[in-house]
A protein has these predicted regions:
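N-terminal cap/recognition module
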Residues: 1-5
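Positively charged, helix-rich recognition surfaces that bind polyanionic ligands
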Residues: 101-104, 116-342
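Acidic carboxylate diad motif detector
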Residues: 6-116
Length: 342
């Protein structure tokens, strides 16, 4: 079913016989079409075994999104402190300076308003002006980045970025999250007793559910902020190129002992944001194959150690070369000659 045929069916057949859903007409017509497209994508991913069966999203409870597009020149006009959204008008932004403004030459194509943990967020899709893409002047030597679980990232120049999940800040929030989840579970058990007619305490589930959502959102924001600051510091040195490894994250997630640690590192988000930032700064991003022996190869003589174990944190070669395992891998990635440009 195309978007046009869906609109004809919705307006001429469904809504006249279902007046309780008349609120659908309050939003943009393209927003309803986009919702059907998202549903089609969800079922496609389900049949490809990429995700679970799609769940119904109730508009007043679930973390749902409202999609909008630019229909005329006056729509989607963004200023530093507010944005003009179709059917809503001017909406004030709490955090200023995050969205690209129209006066600076950015052209907004579409956007979405989402609700997460009791807060509303807006994201936009824009056309990047040519003046924003920087030239390749005054660049320094290239760097290699080795991502891992012990340390988040080890650079070929010796810079080490710690694992944010091992800090006391994250551990304290995760401890609060575990307690909040246990409390929510007990409330659901009390609700079952109340339905059976047994004596139980009144369960205020929605408030506790919101507390759990806020803790999840807080932890996620701390990790995302750390990734953004790490990438900004890497790109600030203006290297001629940045080389990373194409990690097999899907295979790493199959290890039940490491899956939680791999998921919390957010390697895919790091790669996508690094790719975007390198494009803005005019830096070449090189991606080396996952089969490249970056950790097993000696950076001094090129010999490959086949007996290297994961517990061996210091790389020792027969030629006398001794180096930290992750630093050796980062140096090999920097000097790799077989790669793809992202």
């Amino acid at each position: 079913m195309s978007g046009k045929s869906f609109s004809v069916w919705l307006n001429n057949e469904y809504l006249p016989t279902h007046p309780e859903y008349s609120w659908i007409k309050e939003v943009s017509s393209k927003a309803t079409k986009h919702a059907v497209e998202c549903g089609c994508t969800a079922f496609t991913r389900f049949f490809k075994h990429q995700s679970g069966f799609p769940k119904f999203k109730k508009k007043d409870i679930s973390d749902v999104k409202m999609y909008f597009v630019k229909n005329n020149p006056k729509d989607c006009y963004c200023e530093r402190h507010r944005i003009n959204i179709p059917t809503l008008g001017w909406v004030r932004l709490k955090e200023k300076g995050y969205l690209p403004t129209t006066k600076d030459g950015w052209r907004i194509r579409s956007g979405a308003v989402s609700k997460k943990a009791g807060r509303y967020y807006v994201s936009v899709l824009v056309d990047v002006p040519d003046s924003q893409v920087k030239s390749k002047e005054d660049q320094t030597e290239g760097i290699g980045i080795d991502l891992g679980l012990k340390e988040f990232a080890v650079l070929s120049n010796g810079k080490i970025y710690k694992n944010i999940n091992k800090t006391s800040r994250i551990k304290k929030l995760e401890k609060q999250l575990r307690r909040a989840q246990r409390c929510l579970s007990r409330k659901y058990e009390n609700l079952k007793k109340m339905k059976k007619g047994e004596s139980a305490q009144r369960a205020n589930i929605q408030k506790q559910k919101l507390r759990v959502q806020k803790l999840h959102q807080r932890i996620n924001q701390i990790r995302t902020d750390y990734i953004n600051k790490t990438i900004a510091e890497m790109v600030k040195t203006k290297p001629s190129h940045i080389t990373i490894e194409d990690l097999n994250v899907k295979g790493m997630m199959k290890n039940r002992h490491l899956s939680k640690a791999v998921e919390s590192e957010k390697f895919y988000e790091f790669r996508e944001k690094l790719m975007m930032k390198c494009h803005e700064e005019g830096i070449e991003l090189r991606v080396v194959s996952r089969w490249y022996p970056s950790s097993r190869k000696c950076h001094s003589c090129g010999c490959i150690r086949k007996d290297l174990k994961l517990s061996d944190r210091i790389y020792r070669c027969s030629c006398g070369y001794i180096e930290d395992r992750d630093r050796n891998a980062a140096l090999n990635l920097k000097d790799a000659v077989t790669y793809e440009i992202a």
